[in-house]
Swiss-Prot record:
Protein name (Swiss-Prot/TrEMBL): SURF1-like protein
Family in the record: Belongs to the SURF1 family.
PROSITE patterns xref list: SURF1
Keyword Glycoprotein assigned: no
Annotated TM spans: 78-98, 293-313
Membrane-protein topology: Multi-pass membrane protein
Signal peptide interval: none
One cellular component (GO) term of this entry: mitochondrion
Major subcellular location class: mitochondrion
Pfam families, sorted: SURF1 (PF02104)
Highest classification ranks of the organism: Eukaryota, Metazoa, Ecdysozoa, Nematoda, Chromadorea
Alphabetic keyword roster: Membrane, Mitochondrion, Mitochondrion inner membrane, Transmembrane, Transmembrane helix
Underlying gene: sft-1
Length: 317
């Protein structure tokens, strides 16, 4: 409105002023056109720059993304059956955990029995009476029948005083006696019943197997001693048969030993405190129970992981 009013006033005044106003009006229109055109071109250019800065997606991009997100397990009879392999391995691993706990509790139970106070050996020497007393400490009174002694060998040392063991390949014991030896078994007549049982007096090196070499250490007369109740053992693998006729004994077969030596099928391990200097070393009760369950459970759980990864790789598409 103000611009039009200025033109009208200039026309009224007449003269060159009107022409100058017309020129000014023309310049103003050119300026407005240039301003509009520049703004449009600048906006278009910025739009092109933004388009260049935007990452260009390949035609297969969306398809690949879709494929990655759409991987699923192919459930079928075969996949379900194959899933049984890791499941089976896992169940065995869990079972070995329970076995490990049981074995550790058993070892602790046996150790606690050895540390209990000694009780009198019952008069009833039947297996049903003595089996619950295995690894229990008992007290007996009687006399040794040294003329009937025999040796079971080879046997390592298991007494508390030893520093090394023949079972792990040692060559010398702490008192410098060869670790190659055996256990000296001597029949023992009970004072109260007159029955004869077998007592493992302890470990001897091979050069003391001759009865004359340890005769001076043999207890004489009536003695009172503490010992550990043991039961018979199965013949270990790769161990030969006993040969009683030749006095060769490899393992503890109570029925066979009792029949051959005319005793009750009862076996006691003399306590370590019964050791006589220069004689058999008592305390040969071995409670090192085999315990491989940790290795077993590690194997089964590793197999579970491997088979599960193989299953996922096979059936996840």
């Amino acid at each position: 409105m103000a611009f039009r009013w200025a033109i009208q006033m200039a026309l009224r005044r007449g003269g060159g002023g009107g022409q100058r106003l017309l020129l000014t009006q023309h310049q103003h229109q050119n300026y407005q056109f240039f301003k509009t055109s520049s703004s449009t071109q600048f906006s278009t250019r910025n739009s092109q720059i933004l388009d260049l800065d935007t990452p260009q997606k390949s035609p297969n991009f969306s398809e690949n993304s879709k494929n990655k997100k759409s991987k699923k397990i192919e459930w079928s009879t075969g996949s379900i059956l194959m899933l049984g392999l890791p499941a089976f391995a896992f169940s065995l691993g869990v079972w070995q955990i329970y076995r490990l706990i049981w074995k550790l509790e058993l070892i602790e139970h046996l150790k606690s029995r050895l540390s209990q106070e000694a009780i009198e050996l019952p008069d009833d020497l039947s297996s049903s009476s003595l089996e619950p007393l295995e690894y229990c400490r008992v007290r007996v009174t009687g006399e040794f029948l040294h003329q009937k002694e025999f040796v079971i060998s080879p046997r390592g040392r298991f007494d508390p005083a030893k520093k090394t063991s023949a079972s792990v390949g040692s060559m010398l014991s702490e008192n410098e006696m060869s670790s190659h030896g055996g256990h000296l078994i001597t029949p023992f007549r009970l004072k109260n019943t007159g029955k004869v049982i077998l007592i493992n007096r302890g470990w001897l090196p091979t050069f003391y197997f001759d009865p004359e070499s340890h005769a001076k250490t043999n207890p004489q007369g009536t003695v009172i001693l503490e010992a550990i109740v043991r039961k018979t053992e199965q013949r270990p693998q790769f161990v030969g048969q006993n040969v009683p006729e030749q006095g060769v004994w490899y393992y503890r077969d109570l029925e066979q030993m009792a029949k051959w030596h005319g005793t009750e099928p009862v076996w006691l391990d003399a306590a370590y405190e019964t050791t006589v200097p220069g004689g058999p070393i008592g305390g040969q009760t071995n409670i090192n129970v085999r315990n491989e369950h940790m290795n077993y459970l590690t194997t089964w759980f590793t197999l579970t992981l491997v088979t599960m990864l193989m299953w996922i790789h096979k059936f996840r598409k």
